[in-house]
Amino acid sequence: MKFTKMHGCGNDYVYVNLFEEKLDDPARVSIYVSDRHFGIGSDGLITIGPSDKADFRMRIYNADGSEAEMCGNGIRCVAKYVYDHKLTDKTEISVETGAGIKYLTLYVEENKVSQVRVDMGEPILTPGDIPVVKTDGSAYGDDYRVIDEPISAGNREWHMTCVSMGNPHAVVFVDDVAGFELEKYGPLFENHKMFPKRTNTEFVEILSRNEAKMRVWERGSAETWACGTGTCATVMACILNKKTDNKVLVHLRGGDLTIEYIPETNHVFMTGPATEVFSGEIDIM
């Protein structure tokens, strides 16, 4: 199997071009190639193929083989791959994802894509669509918004704000994100009974009205160095809690992303880098 390893702010995936390759069991392949000791090493597998609705279709598989609806860092790398590998010469493209069609603008330097701006669409705040439920398993009302909501995890009380960007996110504000015990608390949020489909969790430190630091515990992949949808969800949570303005620079372990919310259209835009690491071939056992 031919592959290309790429990353967006350190959020790394193995990319497979389905115009050239065939994968019978991508979930199993994702588990195999993601292993950082016995495989290639990545946060998961992303396939790039044809779409009858958009220019391209991407599918995302986590390191545990589960399929994700959307990946903001991953879709930027898809844009870089299809342009740099001559699958398109357009600098504005559409990509079909499990969370709908996304529209991307490619910024090209010396015939290579360096940055990508993604229209991530509208944030989803309806609890049943995220999904998130009450601690007793009952549903919130459709008009309710899970903002600064109490939650118990690890014998502690927290406050979270829940947003979906096509996949579920719980955002928690902390005083010191660098020293935060993510490995301890991340799994407790991911598998909490309030999240019927599990959740991604962002722990966020506010630096100013237009700057924040974030670490993320991804559903199915543990801590990753960046999460594009999570960064968008984080900025929406910041705005909903009146902690920042509508355009925020977010510092992640693997780099920086700029997120902008446009109230007039209710759309979130993400701008950030995409990097190709190497290409190769691997025998799938």
PLM region descriptions:
Residues 1-22, 118, 136-163:
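N-terminal, positively charged, Ser/Thr/Ala/Gly-biased leader segments
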Residues 90-142:
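Hydrophobic alpha-helical segments and helix pairs
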